[in-house]
Amino acid sequence: MMKKLLAGVLCWGLLFAAAPAARALTVEPATDRTFDLPCQAAILIDEDSGTVLYEKNADEQRPVASITKVMTLLLTFEAMEEGRIHADDLVPVSEHAYHMGGSQIWLEPGEQMTLDDMLKAICIASANDAAVAVAEYVGGSEPVFVSMMNEKAAALGMTNTHFENACGLDAEGHLSTARDVAVMSREVLLNHPLVKEYCTVWQDSLRGGETQLVNTNKMLKSYTGITGLKTGTTGKAGVCISASAERDGLRLIAVVLG
């Protein structure tokens, strides 16, 4: 269901890429009355300009599940590009990270895994334990890292977002909006293109082949031009996705929540 809904949004937006002359015209954004999606909230934006092409309840605060990890990835890639951490660093696993529920790669306390492999686990399998382990490695602790997440959200103008954890598990006050998700998604896609290399991998493995990873974003197999980004599902959030796609030079970001 989620795949069909989001594909509909992207197909609608990508119609502009089908005709070369279309990009020279003024695009009139759709409204709820002309184009509606059976979801709680959604937004479609042009990745390059940030222009909003469609929105529905885009400023309504909602849980966003593992789409939270977009911010975790954003801060991690920033730290890598600043030289504070490196892809071949060994990231230790704490008791706290070990106890994360939901999607995981079954990390053990005291286990070490390269940052590169942790990023694969986050981007491909949406592993909560890996997300928290990386958050602790970058920030020193998850609470400190979450403060960094909220500071970054404020700096990006994400005024309706507040994070309580680094992985997106349901928590009181852990909320964002379709618009804010689009903002942070655009930030990581434009400024940290390495994220696409991780998020577009369909299958990989860890621990010498013992742990198999299959991407949670099934649109990689069903929609031509998908470049990312992150799915998410929890009891409170429902099914969510922030998806990016490119065709004929037109790059779009679609966010569907609930």
PLM features per residue range, with description:
Residues 1-9:
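Bacterial N-terminal signal peptides that target proteins for export
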Residues 4-5, 24, 70, 247:
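Hydrophobic alpha-helical segments, especially transmembrane helices
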Residues 8-17:
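Bacterial N-terminal signal peptides
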Residues 10, 38, 87, 214-215, ...:
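A generic structural signal for well-ordered coil/turn residues at beta-strand boundaries
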Residues 16-26:
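Bacterial Sec-dependent signal peptides at the C-terminal "C-region" and cleavage site
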Residues 24-179, 189-190:
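Active-site-adjacent loops and short helices of periplasmic peptidoglycan-processing enzymes
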Residues 155-162, 166-258:
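Domain-terminus/edge residues, biased toward the C-terminal soluble/receptor-binding domains
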